[in-house]
Amino acid sequence: MSGFTRYNKILNLFSEQRSSWTVLEISDELKTPSSTIYRIVRELVLAEFLESAAGAYFRLGPAFIKFNRIINLSDPLVRAGQPFLKKLANENPIESVNVLARLYGNKVMCVADYKSPFFKNNTSYQKGKLMPLIYGATSRAIIMKIVGKSLEDLLKQETFYDDNDKDTFFKNLKNDNKKGYCKTEGQVDKGLIGFAVPINNKKLGIEASLSSIFNSIDFLPEHEPIIYANLTSYSLLIERYINQIFDDIQNYHQISS
């Protein structure tokens, strides 16, 4: 291991399922001498990316909490959209989970969410969790506005069951564009139905979506136009606020220079 890769590989070992590691365990997992791992872990502890846990174990450190706060206060999409998620939930006709998600490379990540107090199930779309690109309304709404070679490049590493599955995907994407929103049921989580609309800002390089997720058992056809109207209204508000944030950033840099 060399350069940043060595730090990245160690940090990526930590997960919800495995939150603490010893130097020896990391050494075995990465097939790297324990002396090398010890030196890197010591550097990560000094930088507060890791901290000592019980015994000889280490866990993720306070640096991540600090950076999470900075992102929450500075990220344009989070700043513009998070305040509206609870309002959207309150205006939806049934209990819902409401999600802001964004494209990072070729994966989708939830950056903010709000769950109605009486919503019974959990969704896979949770803050900080990477999600598949081609399944679920939340993800599909993001890529429905990407066209041509950009879309081809984005989907290069995606695996479809067969050519028919791929054709169906593009046909659905075309229909989504005509309707202005995506709707899927059970693609990511069984028993849940999702609706999503795109949010874009080319100046800030933001390709994102706003979505509402419901229990399928609660959903009635007459809810659909209300859900679509709510999502559309709030997505326009969020895009307007993102534009204001862009103007603020631009003005700040002009004054600084």
What are these regions (language model features)?
Residues 29, 75, 225-229:
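Juxtamembrane membrane-water interface segments immediately C-terminal to a transmembrane helix
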Residues 163-240:
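Extended hydrophobic
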Residues 49-51, 101, 199:
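A structural signal for short hydrophobic beta-strand segments in well-ordered beta-sheet cores
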Residues 1-74, 236-240:
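N-terminal helix-turn-helix
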Residues 244-257:
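Short, highly charged C-terminal tails/helix-capping segments
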Residues 60-154:
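Amphipathic alpha-helical effector-binding/dimerization core
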